[in-house]
Amino acid sequence: MVPRGDTDLDPAAYGEHIADVYDEWYSTADREPEVAVAVDFLRTRVGAGPALELGVGTGRLALPLAARGTTVVGIDASPRMVARLRDKPGGSEVDVVLGDFAEVTAPGGPFGLVYVVFNTFFALADQDAQVRCFANVAAGLQPGGLFVMEAFVPDVTRYDRGQRVQADRLDGETTHLNVSLHDPVFQRVRSRHLTLGPGGVGTYPVDVRYAWPSELDLMGRLAGLELTERWAGWNGEPFTATSTSHVSVWRRPQ
Ligand SMILES: C[S@@+](CC[C@H](N)C(=O)[O-])C[C@H]1O[C@@H](n2cnc3c(N)ncnc32)[C@H](O)[C@@H]1O
């Protein structure tokens, strides 16, 4: 028997739970400079476009990118996240396909740029889904088109005997905790972001299957893509052995 690990991951679960608070938590004023730099980075790599965002969510990056004149298409599994995007100014400018980005193809291609940010690639539950995603991305790119990914570099020292409980922040009367279980064989971390406050207890699932940059590069090679850039952040910071995140660019050869 070949162990498969726990793959009961619903692609819509994260977004359906978090949609009401996502922008309040992650689309905050202090993050605006980083969004602006990320949009600049993407703008300079989109060529003649169009662009496709995997896991477009509430449009945190897609909307400012579209506002700068790029045609942006998105895929997302969560109807509630997409409803948030639709309600925003410019929301009707971004076409969104509802579905799993490892499986569905978006209309409007081939794309000059496909991108996936904020660790969203790791939402795919296992290596097979991640390999399929790379293959679909490669098939949807124009010759010379680019695939950009922003993701964390795994750090398994975070876990003590396969678990971690972390106080994330105190927000007024509300305490934010993160409770995680780590499976190093399948490279999975199942987490629950818990909020404890006057309104009661909130629980938000965040389940990921992480991969090191070297494994992502191998997925790229399997899909016929070549790594052309790797930075530690959107500002072009050098990527080193101590970097905790990366912005990587793979290219479909001409
Ligand atoms: C962390 S949010 C990022 C949203 C947006 N890209 C941003 O930067 O704010 C992850 C998004 O990916 C979506 N998602 C997660 N797994 C997915 C999958 N397998 N297929 C499609 N969308 C998925 C979620 O619904 C959510 O909207």
What are these regions (language model features)?
Residues 59-104:
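Class I SAM-dependent methyltransferase SAM/SAH-binding core
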Residues 105-113:
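A short acidic, Gly/Pro-enriched loop at the edge of an enzyme's catalytic core
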Residues 112-128:
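A short SAM/SAH-binding and catalytic strip from SAM-dependent methyltransferases
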Residues 1-57:
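Conserved class I S-adenosyl-L-methionine
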Residues 148-219:
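SAM-dependent methyltransferase
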Residues 131-143:
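A short glycine-rich, Lys/Arg-flanked "PGG" loop and its adjoining helix->strand segment in the class I
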Residues 211-254:
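C-terminal lobe and adjacent flexible extensions of AdoMet/dcAdoMet transferase-like proteins
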